[in-house]
Amino acid sequence: MFYTENYDVIVIGGGHAGTEAALAPARMGLKTLLLTHNVDTLGQMSCNPAIGGIGKGHLVREIDAMGGLMATAADQAGIQFRTLNSSKGPAVRATRAQADRVLYRQAVRIALENQENLDIFQQEVTDIILDQDRVCGVVTKMGLKFHAKAVILTAGTFLSGKIHIGLENYTGGRAGDPASVMLADRLRELNLRVDRLKTGTPPRIDARTIDFSVLAKQHGDEKLPVFSFMGSVDQHPRQIPCFITHTNEQTHEVIRNNLDRSPMYAGIIEGIGPRYCPSIEDKVMRFSERNSHQIYLEPEGLTSNEIYPNGISTSLPFDVQMKIVNSMKGMEKARIIKPGYAIEYDYFDPRDLKPTLETKSIRGLFFAGQINGTTGYEEAAGQGLLAGINAGLFVQEKEAWFPRRDQAYIGVLVDDLCTLGTKEPYRVFTSRAEYRLLLREDNADSRLTPIAHQLGLIDEKRWARFNQKMENIELERQRLRQIWLHPRSEYLDEANKVLGSPLVREASGEDLLRRPEMNYQILTSLTPFQPAMDDQEAVEQVEIAIKYQGYIEHQQEEIARQKRHESTAIPAHFDYTVVSGLSNEVRAKLEQHRPVSIGQASRISGVTPAAISILLVSLKKQGMLKRGE
């Protein structure tokens, strides 16, 4: 039976990738259908109750700059906001919000249900309808068929998902939800490379059974950040603290004594887990010299007693999980509400995708999210947005669009996946981007909002606000260029009081702002440079653009030079252990692959352009920088 209406775009799955994938073509004016197995879990935070972080916060801002939902939902659900790396340079500063799961899911559903051109239907999809090498619809479990010109698959961990708790396992997409087995079997018949990955989650703890009085509190920032460029602190709900406890030798002894009951160490789980979010079993074994690991006790919401113990993801049996939890300070009488578990699932080799996230073998079929080998809500949402945009452009027979590496972290993510592939769950870090001084959280709108406007993704209110901000930035930069202070000025004494060294020659406002001891607030407190601008976002842009101008230009030159070193030889017995600045992951991969040239090294999965720069410097220092034949 065919559904009475035809659609331009169908999205399968209502998680973080699926919601962004559905909203984008709908905003572009295309008739879109979102199919989900359960409308009550749209926007569900299946693992940790948080949005943002290093690299991830950058993705959230980019999604927002293009009219996406994640930042707005986080602003409305965030119960603790922090700016990470606030004392470091602007390239690595990142926003993170602890989120109320219920409020987040509520914000997502409201946005979806109020979006024009978007329908939602609850049914599991079991098959994809193909006409030779082109997708033309889907089939649901009840036999209902839907026609569409493009289909986006965002199935998360549901494809042949298998949940492990100790040596017991059963099929499931996540705790409480069924796996998508029929669709997984159908996809395995297609010309796509499939493999298995795994991820895990910690047990959830009853807050009423924790002794918080003996634990350290962690509050959010006093000056609360916001994620969305259209957001406001007024949108934030009540802010609450997290708490910190630690594992100890007793905890580690419990884990070591029960490794034979771990599905990972017993060889039952075949999928590779996320390197940067390891299970507590992995942490204890990999870092055996450490006798303690910090654990963050994160509230799951304002109206929930559930606590998420960030740092003890595990698939050990329930009785062992209880011993682990009860071994920690403040947790001696803690009770588990939900057991931790590991989940294995199908993912597709992202090298079989175009940079638009359309499959190379089937026209009009797009993949986004964890099924492409990534981990994290933000990575999924970024892919969903990109797939949604390109599905919309495909339907309209318009030229595809995807961001370059120098345009967005979404561009870095997709380029890494489609060019290099991945054998382990991929997450974004600022260190993966060679252009990170250009790809800051604060300038995501200037990088991407004009493109979003061209694509029809943002409304006129956002466009007008963006243009006003850009105008404010340009006018203020012009003003600071035109105001000069000279050694004979009547304001010299006032200026010298705040300058690290006395002014000996004429300087503009921009020249003074470049000084390390100077910032915009101090500069505009000086009589010649008053008044200060009210637009704080524009102020931040002005200050960063002036202070980091030289660094940005230097980085662009570095990239051009790096391209010239494609054939630079690496000695066969080069010692990577002496190269300072390489991450353990990169060093291990270089040792394993032993590339013969810089070009070859740059194409190893996980070896970042930033790592290549470090390697080039080391080769030069050791007198080994020679071009290949």
From Swiss-Prot:
InterPro entries the UniProt entry points to: FAD/NAD-bd_sf (IPR036188), GIDA_C_N (IPR049312), MnmG (IPR004416), MnmG-rel (IPR002218), MnmG-rel_CS (IPR020595), MnmG_C (IPR026904), MnmG_C_subdom (IPR047001), MnmG_C_subdom_sf (IPR044920)
Stated family: Belongs to the MnmG family.
Role summary: NAD-binding protein involved in the addition of a carboxymethylaminomethyl (cmnm) group at the wobble position (U34) of certain tRNAs, forming tRNA-cmnm(5)s(2)U34.
SUPFAM superfamilies in alphabetical order: FAD/NAD(P)-binding domain (SSF51905)
Gene Ontology molecular function terms on file: flavin adenine dinucleotide binding
Keywords: Cytoplasm, FAD, Flavoprotein, NAD, tRNA processing
Keyword Flavoprotein tagged: yes
Lineage: Bacteria, Pseudomonadati, Pseudomonadota, Gammaproteobacteria, Pasteurellales
Subcellular localization, as worded in the UniProt entry: Cytoplasm
Coiled coil: none
GO biological process: tRNA methylation; tRNA wobble uridine modification
Pfam families assigned: GIDA, GIDA_C_1st, SAM_GIDA_C
Binding sites annotated in the UniProt record for FAD: G13, G14, G15, H16, A17, G18, V125, S180, Q370
Gene Ontology CC entries for this record: cytosol
HAMAP family: MnmG_GidA
Name under which the protein is recorded: tRNA uridine 5-carboxymethylaminomethyl modification enzyme MnmG
Binding annotation for NAD(+): 273-287
Essential cofactor(s): FAD
Subunit composition and interactions: Homodimer. Heterotetramer of two MnmE and two MnmG subunits.
